[in-house]
């Protein structure tokens, strides 16, 4: 992610317009956790039977259950109730008064393997298989959570995403307080557990008997339980059907209805060139030409696909629960392409590039991108990742003060994915860019583009959204996701970039607990446009009508902007192998580094992998120094950074390593070798060392 895309002035003005207001008590709350109406979250308490749904359920929230902003408006986005289950990356949230995580012995982020201990106090079981799901648990350690009365949620995170369409049971048992005493169950749950439910929970007895039976089978004693509940994950179709429908109809209109074969067919998308800039060698020794234009893309949003537009859906057929977006004309998507000088003699490999947080395709002229283009003869093209592009900043500001409107971001992200797919097809269709004079070599008069294959190479937000794009892509089969991760509800509270957002978010929703709940809720919509919702289909299990893909995930150790833990969760979800040694001594907080991620070997180097890049400990020149916060350390000429904190806070010490991997020649060499038709993950670091970013020697 790139920092401070939201204009501080705009944020300040918007924040000042929020005025306090009271709100009525919510109804329809689960009595099993009375701290907040949404707790425990997620829970099948908030679902209803739905005919035609792939899970036989749909979400069933109401506005009265959601936190209100200071204007008194509920943060409930109605689009949530189109989901047939919850996010595959859901954090499991509840409030346990007085819990001490260490005394309880719950699996921590530093030792995930503890989840499988026979007496593990926090267990998540897949109802279908009876197997435990790997998790780690923490209390919210953000300063606002600690200072807020009853503000520290128990947060249980999946170490890899939950399976689509599966139902899980959460079991909390033998929880301890700071003195080591067992925390008693709440009255409502105790009545269910003891077989004598009363009041509001009496009608749930039959359902809970099934839960207790499953837990008994898993050797979890009913009498030991503090709390248990179940939840169901959204189905593959529900998560992806909007984007797949948009893709399939758009490519069919071009004359290509067989996208699974990975072959280009039909006509090229319509486009126009607005500007051609030829550079002298004095202007750029690396890039020969930049071309700016617009490509015509089917539009599936209101407002002509402008920021704030949302989807409308075709009427479902009888007995069908689906969400198929209506096409609403077309839109003109901006593109920028840069042709390297090397392409004037040898056609360049074409690659899409995705920009940073709330950024723009102008980032395609960054030094590291031009280096990659020049060193490895690659032509990069970019289009705004609308939904989260610079033009969406006003909408983002509005959403932070009113989360009920969040579907406008999620919907436009999916349109942005389609725009990138259409641009990619234009790059490799022989009658597209390759046939245009603007894309021909000035030396040979031949096309400067090698149209035999398309690739994806991106960083930060471009990588977070890029996993979703990869899962949907019919044209590129290999993607590099640089300094990325997945699951914004996990990423943002652990990112320094969130400081800027909270200039609006905190005044609008004053409780940290409410803000965490809202982030967790909107993740169910965010999934439709980022890797978290497509994780099970990025590599090994392609979506319908889609070829298989491989990815190379580059991670910056201790990244200040994209939480490293989210990248490792992504690696486990995507089935990646990991380059070892991943860390030098003392450079990981994990008892078992890269836990449950197999090792990269010569035998699997043709597949998908995770590689961690280390900028080294804090130092000024060659002298190791105490780490200061990023800006202060930067002013002193400091480089390097410590390992990320283990809590739910952002790393702030040392120089932010976020941009270092892409600035490292060895990392670019590794990317280039991977981004070939028969590419592999090559070894570019000493065999007995972790990979070091530029500036940190071996």
Q: Which positions does each model-derived feature cover?
A:
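Bacterial N-terminal signal peptides that target proteins for export
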Residues: 1-10
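C-terminal segment of classical bacterial N-terminal signal peptides
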Residues: 16-24
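Acidic, low-complexity Ser/Thr/Gly/Pro-rich repeat segments typical of extracellular/periplasmic
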Residues: 26-279, 284-305
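Structural recognition of the beta-strand scaffold that forms the well-ordered cores
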Residues: 92-94, 232, 292, 350-353, ...
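A conserved hydrophobic secondary-structure block that centers on an alpha-helix together
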Residues: 146-173, 177-178, 328-366
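Cap/lid segment of the alpha/beta-hydrolase catalytic domain
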Residues: 303-333, 344-443
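C-terminal subdomain of alpha/beta-hydrolase-fold enzymes, centered on the catalytic histidine
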Residues: 408-415, 477-698
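Primarily recognizes the serine-hydrolase "nucleophile elbow" in alpha/beta-hydrolase
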Residues: 430-493
């Amino acid at each position: 992610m790139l920092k401070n895309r939201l204009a501080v002035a705009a944020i300040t003005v918007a924040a000042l317009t929020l005025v306090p207001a009271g709100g009525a008590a919510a109804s329809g709350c689960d009595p099993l956790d009375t701290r907040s109406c949404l707790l425990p979250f997620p829970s099948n308490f908030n679902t209803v039977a739905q005919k035609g749904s792939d899970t036989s359920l749909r979400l069933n929230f109401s506005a009265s259950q959601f936190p209100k902003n200071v204007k008194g408006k509920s943060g409930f986005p109605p689009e949530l109730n189109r989901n047939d289950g919850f996010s595959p990356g859901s954090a499991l949230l509840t409030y346990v008064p007085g819990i001490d995580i260490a005394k309880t012995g719950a699996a921590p982020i530093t030792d995930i393997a503890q989840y499988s201990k026979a007496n593990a106090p926090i267990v998540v079981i897949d109802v279908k298989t009876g197997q435990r799901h790997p998790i780690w648990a923490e209390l919210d350690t953000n300063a606002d959570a600690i200072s807020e009365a009853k503000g520290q949620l128990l947060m249980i995170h999946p170490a890899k995403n939950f399976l689509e369409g599966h139902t899980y049971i959460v079991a909390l048992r033998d929880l301890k307080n700071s003195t080591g005493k067992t925390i008693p169950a709440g009255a409502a749950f105790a009545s269910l557990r003891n077989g004598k439910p009363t009041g509001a929970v009496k009608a749930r007895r039959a359902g809970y008997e099934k839960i207790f039976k499953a837990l008994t089978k898993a050797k979890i004693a009913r009498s030991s339980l503090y709390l248990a509940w179940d939840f169901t994950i959204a189905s593959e179709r529900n998560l992806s059907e909007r984007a797949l429908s948009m893709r399939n109809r758009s490519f069919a209109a071009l004359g290509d209805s067989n996208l699974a074969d990975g072959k280009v067919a039909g006509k090229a998308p319509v486009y126009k060139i607005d500007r051609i800039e030829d550079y002298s060698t004095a202007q750029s020794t690396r890039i020969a030409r930049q071309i700016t234009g617009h490509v015509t893309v089917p539009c599936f949003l209101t407002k002509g696909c402008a920021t704030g537009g949302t989807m409308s859906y075709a009427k479902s057929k009888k007995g069908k629960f689906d969400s198929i977006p209506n096409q609403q004309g077309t839109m003109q998507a901006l593109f920028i392409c840069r042709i390297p000088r090397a392409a004037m003699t040898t056609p360049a490999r074409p690659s899409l590039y995705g920009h940073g947080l709330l950024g723009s395709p102008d980032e395609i002229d960054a030094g590291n991108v031009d280096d990659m283009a020049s060193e490895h003869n690659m032509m990069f093209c970019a289009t705004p990742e609308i939904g989260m592009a610079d033009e969406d900043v006003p909408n983002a500001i509005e959403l932070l003060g009113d989360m009920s409107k969040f579907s406008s971001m999620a919907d436009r992200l999916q349109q942005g994915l389609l725009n990138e797919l259409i641009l990619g097809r234009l790059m490799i269709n022989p009658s597209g860019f390759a046939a245009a004079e603007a894309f021909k070599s000035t030396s040979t008069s031949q096309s400067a583009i090698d149209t035999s294959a398309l690739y994806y190479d991106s960083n930060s937000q471009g990588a977070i959204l890029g996993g979703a794009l990869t899962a949907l892509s019919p044209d590129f089969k290999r993607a590099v996701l640089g300094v990325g991760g997945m699951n914004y509800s996990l990423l943002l509270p652990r990112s320094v970039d969130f400081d800027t957002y909270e200039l609006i978010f905190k005044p609008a929703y004053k409780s940290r607990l409410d803000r965490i709940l809202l982030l967790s809720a909107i993740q169910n919509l965010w999934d439709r446009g980022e890797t978290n919702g497509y994780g099970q289909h990025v590599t090994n299990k392609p979506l319908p009508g889609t070829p298989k893909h491989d990815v190379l995930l580059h991670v910056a150790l201790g990244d200040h902007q994209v939480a490293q833990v989210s990248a490792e969760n992504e690696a486990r979800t995507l089935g990646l192998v990991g380059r070892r040694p991943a860390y030098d001594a003392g450079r990981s907080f994990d008892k078992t580094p890269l836990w449950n991620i197999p090792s990269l070997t010569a035998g699997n180097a043709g597949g998908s992998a995770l590689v961690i890049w280390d900028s080294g400990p804090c130092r000024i020149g060659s002298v190791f120094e105490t780490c200061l916060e990023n800006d202060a350390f930067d002013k002193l000429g400091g480089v390097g950074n410590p390992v990320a904190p283990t809590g739910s806070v952002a790393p702030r010490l040392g120089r932010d390593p976020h941009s270092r991997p892409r600035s490292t020649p060895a990392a670019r060499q590794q990317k280039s070798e991977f981004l070939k038709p028969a590419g592999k993950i090559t070894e570019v670091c000493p065999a007995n060392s972790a990979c070091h970013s530029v500036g940190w020697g071996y």
